A protein has these predicted regions:
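Basic, Lys/Arg-enriched alpha-helical interface segments
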Residues: 1-67, 76-80, 87-112
């Protein structure tokens, strides 16, 4: 049974602003997430630490010369809600994750 994946409305706006290469690479990873669901593990998916969201995950992929991370969480209906994404290449790892997690948490509160 395939899992469902959906964009938070703000993440959908972010997605259309990404380069075509990033959109294609992200879509390929999302198809894998739909097929496998929450058991998809490292190196493709890992749990983000330091979040108030239980089991906030990151989908990892490379595209357009960047090192991309997409934060998501499964809601009570078994839907993977895509919350926030960004390229962590050339950015302080601590600052990148602080920003990614804060954005994901803010959007998650408006989703529930």
């Amino acid at each position: 049974m395939p899992w469902h994946v959906t964009f938070h409305p703000e993440m959908a706006k972010d997605f259309v602003a990404f380069s075509r290469e990033v959109q294609i690479a992200m879509a390929a990873q999302l198809r894998l997430l739909e097929a496998v669901g929450p058991t998809l593990g490292r190196p493709t998916v890992d749990t983000l630490k330091g979040s108030r969201i239980a089991n906030l995950k990151e989908l990892r992929f490379a595209a357009d010369g960047g090192v991309w991370r997409l934060a998501f969480a499964f809601d009570g209906q078994r839907v993977a809600v895509l919350l926030a994404a960004g390229d962590k290449a050339g950015v302080s790892e601590a600052r990148f994750y602080r920003t990614l997690i804060a954005t994901a948490e803010k959007r998650w509160r408006t989703w529930e």
